[in-house]
Amino acid sequence: MQNIAGVGLGLRRELIDDYLQAEHVPDFIEVAPENWLGLGGRHAKQFAACVERAALFCHGLSLSIGGPHPLNLEFIGQIKQFLKQHQALLYSEHLSYTHDGGYLYDLLPIPMTEEAVDYVAERILKVQDLLGQRLVIENVSTYAMPAAEMTEAEFVCAVLQAADCELLLDVNNVYVNSINHGSDALAFITAMPPERVRYLHVAGHQQISPDLLIDTHGAAINDPVWELLRATYQHIGVRPTLLERDFNIPTWQQIQSELQQIQQLQQEAGDV
């Protein structure tokens, strides 16, 4: 599979016009395939034009890899076709669940137990067999740790090993969880196996109280997350890094400024 480097942008529809008109665009874009499956006409043409300008990563929302119900094989087949049709370089999903008899409209944490490791790994292996490629799983932000028997870092590493999959390391989520649970963000980063880290996410968050952050993707990246990203490059090496901005969409110039800041950190880390 082709590799890509550099900086990327989570492409939201509010950004598409600016993206298509921009003289310089990111190295890659990322979309949720669920938002584009089955669309035709103007939307399909617009999406095709976007993909022509940059490499495509796909980041799913509803696989529910940790959910209690059987995997949706029809949906996985649709994803496989979408990835092939648009020549997506990878498919990532959240290490969480979104279905419990119905769609829950949230990313809920999986109990961090040995039993859950085995269960999730079996489902990831099944998805990888069906897709014919590795799945990239993302560490998620959490606000409670139900029935935890191990740390988050231990759980993520165990799943990566058991399923032989790759990691989308979300640096903002690591920081958010460190505040919400009183954990060590840098210790989490250094515990991740560098050879399995495929790419990174960074984003802004909302502070509700001194010990509660919400991963909103609705604000600029703040200084502690920038510093954690710098440390991440130092410990695991420079990886493709994507900016997420889902709400309170700023100007294209502001988006470009954050992308350039990511690029600057990558260049500095590459010079070390």
Where are these regions (language model features)?
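C-terminal helical cap(s) of enzyme catalytic domains, especially alpha/beta-barrels
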Residues: 252-272
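Gly/Pro-rich active-site loop or hairpin
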Residues: 38-40, 70, 107-117, 178-237
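Hydrophobic faces of well-ordered beta-strands that scaffold small-molecule active sites
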Residues: 5-11, 27-31, 56-59, 91-93, ...
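Boundary/entry segment of secreted carbohydrate-active catalytic domains
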Residues: 1-19
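Acidic/histidine-rich catalytic cores of soluble enzymes
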Residues: 128-212
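Acidic-and-aromatic substrate-binding clefts and catalytic sites of carbohydrate-active enzymes
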Residues: 16-17, 33-45, 64-74, 144-149, ...
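Active-site acidic/histidine proton-transfer and metal-coordination neighborhood
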Residues: 72-167
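Acidic (Asp/Glu)-rich catalytic clusters
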Residues: 19-24, 41-58, 74-89, 125-130, ...
